[in-house]
């Protein structure tokens, strides 16, 4: 397994080993290596104190969290966090321990981690240290807290969102006691900085198992996104919808490609429905004005979570054109591409397909057919490099 670790990381481990320390790779990189996946980044630990790491690696070492024992090592274009093996003191701010005690025990260090699948260490020789059954849970596809789950979530409430994120991205189930503790401790999420919440939601929404997570845990997600709660169980009372507002929403999120613009657009697109609900004389439900109401609520959420400008603009653009209707004809598709641009138009077609896929199964094929045809026409125009806007015309020299 170590042969899959990048050479610069192996060199760092070797230098620590040659200097008399006992280094290990830890956390998500070990989990991903065991899954056969490519790690996004690498973290390591050893008994070396921060000042020893700084001296050993010289210009490659950067003090990014000395109080908690963390030094970032940069070599060969890779940044690796080295955190000295430690035990954590009490948590007062639901994020950082008030004190840490450095140790020379890898088992003690692993005991402070969040989930068993993240509490496995890998030595430079390829030996695994797994005191909490992480490999077994990894094989079974189970997320379980290390030790007492209530304590883990009390230490850092963001771990609750991390739990949901891993369930979404990895497609794992959550062990019963861990689920119960996450629900009992969910109010702790109110104290978490919006930036940290936003970072976790971005990853959660782009997971392959996102629909199941949204349907299973709206009570937890509703702490950080209270706007979703009125949608849960809201009967649309409309023959075109067999799902309540929240289930429809959750299904649309999972039905679009996993880009942040599309996933956020679908999460937000129907938030205004409950406040716009009316029934006609036949008892049929209608939601007049819900698109504008949803867009307004989306603006509040994006401001609160401090979306970066480009993502906010992208979501805003998709919500603005969400209700566009046009026939699956070449001229109409070309006209829409000219109006919105290629990217927004492609996204619009994806939202149309997802929105219809999450309505009544009866007539689904009929509802999808024109949008599939429009997407084929879009692809044809794109392949022909058809001019779609005046700006493109000027660039092309026409």
Labelled PLM ranges:
Residues 1-398:
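Catalytic cores of the polymerase beta-like nucleotidyltransferase superfamily
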């Amino acid at each position: 397994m170590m042969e899959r670790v990048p050479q610069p990381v192996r060199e760092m481990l070797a230098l620590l080993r040659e200097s008399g320390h006992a280094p290990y790779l830890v956390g998500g990189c070990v989990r991903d290596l065991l899954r056969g996946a490519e790690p996004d980044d690498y973290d390591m630990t050893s008994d070396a104190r921060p000042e020893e790491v700084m001296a050993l690696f010289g210009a490659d070492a950067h003090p990014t969290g000395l109080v908690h024992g963390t030094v970032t090592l940069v070599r060969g274009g890779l940044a690796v966090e080295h955190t000295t093996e430690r035990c954590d003191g009490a948590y007062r701010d639901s994020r950082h321990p008030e004190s840490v005690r450095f140790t020379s025990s890898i088992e003690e260090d692993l005991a402070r981690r969040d989930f068993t699948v993240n509490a496995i260490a890998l030595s430079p020789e390829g030996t695994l240290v797994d005191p909490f059954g992480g490999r077994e849970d990894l094989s079974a596809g189970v997320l379980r807290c290390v030790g007492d789950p209530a304590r883990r979530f009390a230490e850092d409430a963001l771990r609750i969102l991390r739990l949901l994120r891993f369930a979404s991205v990895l497609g794992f189930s959550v062990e019963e006691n861990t689920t119960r503790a996450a629900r009992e401790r969910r109010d702790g999420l109110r104290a978490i900085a919006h930036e940290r919440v936003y970072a976790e939601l971005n990853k959660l929404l782009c997971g392959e198992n996102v629909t199941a997570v949204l349907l299973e845990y709206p009570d937890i997600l509703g702490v950080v996104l209270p706007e979703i709660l009125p949608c849960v169980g809201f009967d649309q009372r409309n023959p075109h919808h067999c799902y309540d507002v929240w289930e429809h929403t959750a299904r649309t999120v999972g039905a679009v490609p996993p880009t942040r613009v599309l996933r956020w657009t679908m999460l937000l697109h129907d938030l205004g429905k409950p406040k716009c609900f009316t029934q006609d004389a036949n008892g049929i439900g209608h939601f007049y004005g819900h698109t504008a109401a949803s867009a307004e609520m989306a603006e509040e959420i994006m401001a609160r979570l401090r979306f970066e400008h480009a993502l906010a603009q992208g979501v805003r653009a998709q919500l603005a054109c969400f209700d566009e209707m046009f026939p699956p004809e070449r001229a109409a598709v070309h006209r829409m591409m000219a109006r919105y641009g290629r990217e927004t138009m492609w996204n619009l077609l994806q939202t149309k397909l997802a929105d219809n896929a999450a309505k009544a199964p009866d007539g689904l094929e009929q509802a999808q057919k024109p949008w599939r045809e429009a997407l084929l026409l879009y692809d044809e125009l794109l392949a022909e490099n058809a001019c779609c806007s005046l700006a493109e015309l000027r660039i092309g020299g026409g």
